[in-house]
Amino acid sequence: GGVDLVNGADVRLVPDHIAGRGTSDASTISVEYPSLLTDLLAGDLVVLGDGAISLSVDSVDEHAVHCRVRTGGRVQGRPGVHIPSERLRLSTPTDEDLVLGRAMAEAGADFLAVSFVRSAHDLRVMREAVAPLQVRLVAKVETMSAIAGLDEIIAEADAVMVARGDLGIECPLEDVPHLQKRIVRQCVEAGVPVITATQMMESMIVSPSPTRAEVSDIANAVFDGTDALMLSAETAVGADPVAVVRTMNRIAGRAETEANYRQWGARLGRVQRGRWPRSEEHTSELPVTFLYLVCRLLLEKK
């Protein structure tokens, strides 16, 4: 399945309440965002998903955002549409997020990953919605607003996710590695578990083995001190999800044998004991724990 967008073609972005949910084709993409027509302007660059497809906005009317395809590709399902965070009028989390979050907590979810967190206030709102249930909240850091308020977000979150996909759209790509390391380091210093996510093994959606660059990416995340590595499309729509998990397990495990956590912790100097109980052996060695399915249910914006 999917829709192919060709370079130079005209395409309309239409809110769900006008187009109807899930009615996308090569000329119209249905978007789950009610304020779409007011938050985009002529001249804007719009990217779909994690940035592989880009559109330029020609005009906006009362029914649709009219775009031209700059970089084409295949649109699968209902792709996320990136809108600059400083222009978002939609409150986060949305009312729908709060309802779904409560339902997931009541269903027994261990974690909720809260998307597009812009401040610690967003986490407090979600925490109030799921109270008194003790579900843990994962703050997805994927906007520059979140980077600006990182200290407060880390203090409020039960765990933090380095969501490199949308973060790499919000900022220049060359900044992503530095921001990733900064987020991981600050989480380690605060004793808050941190997850590194997005395109860890993207090639294995179709390939039986990862690229050398992906192998290095996983190992370097381990060496930086990440507590978890998360798979997304590789296991959601990939050809062989089990092989992906086994391969990541092997790479991450090998990296751990090379990491001197005692020396690494001494260099870091300010590592606090984590909020989650660990054994004395684990606390002294500062090991990395790899969670391939970080939570049973993720609260995602699709």
Q: What is the predicted role of each segment?
A:
Residues 1-101:
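Beta-strand/loop-dominated core regions that host nucleotide or nucleotide-derived cofactor-binding catalytic loops
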Residues 13-15, 47-49, 67, 114, ...:
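General beta-strand structural signal in soluble alpha/beta enzymes
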Residues 76-77, 133-149, 246-255, 259:
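Conserved anion-binding
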Residues 76-87, 105-109, 161-166, 256-270:
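Gly-rich Lys/Arg/Thr-decorated short loops/hinges at beta-loop-alpha junctions or inter-strand turns
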Residues 89, 138, 189, 248-280:
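Long, charged amphipathic helices and adjacent flexible linkers at domain junctions
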Residues 89-198, 204-215, 219-222, 236:
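Conserved alpha/beta-domain cores
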Residues 213, 217-268:
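Active-site or pore-adjacent capping/gating segments
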Residues 281-302:
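Single conserved hydrophobic/aromatic residue that forms the stacking wall/gate
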